[in-house]
Amino acid sequence: MSTVLTALHEALDSAPEQDMTTRLDQSWLLGFDTETTGTSPNRDNIVSASLVLRNPRTGYEGDAVAEWIINPGRHISEGASRVNGFTDEYLAENGSEPAESIEQIAGLIMTAQSKHIPLLAYNAPFDVRMLNGDIRQWCSGGMEPMPEKELLVVDPLVIDRAISHRSGRRTLTYTTEYYGVVPHGDFHDATTDTVASVDLIEPMTTLYPQVGSITLGELMDWQRDAHRTWLKQFNEWLTSKGSRPAIDTWF
């Protein structure tokens, strides 16, 4: 086991088991992001992933971080390669064996879940479903996919749509700029994206105290309601343009 992976294990083991009355602005968080061969769970694969454990008392300086480079043994699409910079040749030379890496990532996430430490990801369904697709492909003998409907998740994209009524795009790049979050590196690097996503919670909960006061026990219902409200408005707009309504894909 690598030194950084050991450090994350130790930090997670020493983290407290949180009560469900813990407020979001006082909660430990486990940030998660992936880079992939494409955008289709069950067809594409993860090539890079990062987990970042954030202690609310120490912030960025106290983060425990682990990153994986994974060789799925398949072609990465040109579009994905342009976005994340990975090539087939680089992954073949530097990537780890998929099953072990995917088991490590999922195991750490479920350890955090057992302590009521939310999994934080920007547009969380994508990363969770990519991971579950890889669990099904690589770990069918020893690990079940994560129970998506039972996960405790923080999705800054869902929160932002509920509290900020600005116009324009809501990619991670634009959203961090809006909230004054400066990335620690280049976007579309899994660790940079993970840290930036976690960093969003402080300005969001400071600017909107009603978000900071959401308890872990209230968190999923609040986000589901917020997503349904946004989706209804978005589909009304799509319909007015003659487009087909979007399907609900949140947890």
Residues covered by each model-derived region:
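Short, surface-exposed acidic-centric catalytic microdomains
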Residues: 64-84
